[in-house]
Structures are given as structure tokens and as C-alpha cells.
Curated annotation (Swiss-Prot):
One of its GO terms (molecular function) is rRNA binding. One of its GO terms (biological process) is translation. Protein S19 forms a complex with S13 that binds strongly to the 16S ribosomal RNA. InterPro entries: Ribosomal_uS19, Ribosomal_uS19_bac-type, Ribosomal_uS19_CS, Ribosomal_uS19_SF. SUPFAM superfamilies: Ribosomal protein S19 (SSF54570). Keywords: Ribonucleoprotein, Ribosomal protein, RNA-binding, rRNA-binding. PANTHER family: RIBOSOMAL PROTEIN S19P FAMILY MEMBER, SMALL RIBOSOMAL SUBUNIT PROTEIN US19M. One of its GO terms (cellular component) is cytoplasm. Belongs to the universal ribosomal protein uS19 family. It comes from Hahella chejuensis (strain KCTC 2396). Pfam families: Ribosomal_S19 (PF00203). This is Small ribosomal subunit protein uS19.
């Protein structure tokens, strides 16, 4: 369910400050964050943000198409390894 338009997009303040300083200094190092719930803003385009997936930080290079989406959408938390093979099919 999308967020109400009257509330506006959400971004954690600590992440916003890190993004602003990275843009000011023109720093290309990945910004580590645990904030998967933050919305991607236009200021983030061109930056690499390392989003935590519960186990490690996944580097996400932000493009213009990603604006408006959440950071967590681009760092998968579950790995699907397929269903167990059927014993009858192996014979």
C-alpha cells in the first residue's frame, strides 16, 4: 500500500545527511546504511549506497529509474535455492 501523498516521502535523517555531505564533497565511496525503508531521492542519483540485507551490505548504484522506490527493494533478503528434488524423478 503506497504512502499518503499528504505525508510525503520518508528518508532517515542520518542517511540524508550522509548523502548531502557526499554530494558536497563529490565522494564516490559507498554509503553504508541499514535503512531499507528510506525512499530514494533525486539527490542520490549517481551514488553507491550499501544497503544491509540482514547478513551483509549489498552495493546499490542509484540511477534515475530508481527514484521514488525504497532502498530495500534493491537488496534481496532471501536466497531461493529451488525446491527439493523428487526421489522418483532421480531414478
Amino acid at each position: 500500500m503506497p504512502r499518503s501523498l499528504k505525508k510525503g516521502p520518508f528518508i532517515d535523517l542520518h542517511l540524508l545527511k550522509k548523502v548531502e555531505t557526499a554530494v558536497e564533497v563529490k565522494d564516490k565511496k559507498p554509503i553504508k546504511t541499514w535503512s531499507r525503508r528510506s525512499t530514494i531521492f533525486p539527490e542520490m542519483v549517481g551514488l553507491t549506497i550499501a544497503v544491509h540485507n540482514g547478513r551483509q551490505h549489498v552495493p546499490v548504484y542509484v540511477t534515475e529509474d530508481m527514484v521514488g522506490h525504497k532502498l530495500g527493494e534493491f537488496a534481496a533478503t532471501r536466497t531461493y535455492r529451488g525446491h527439493a528434488a523428487d526421489k522418483k524423478a532421480k531414478r
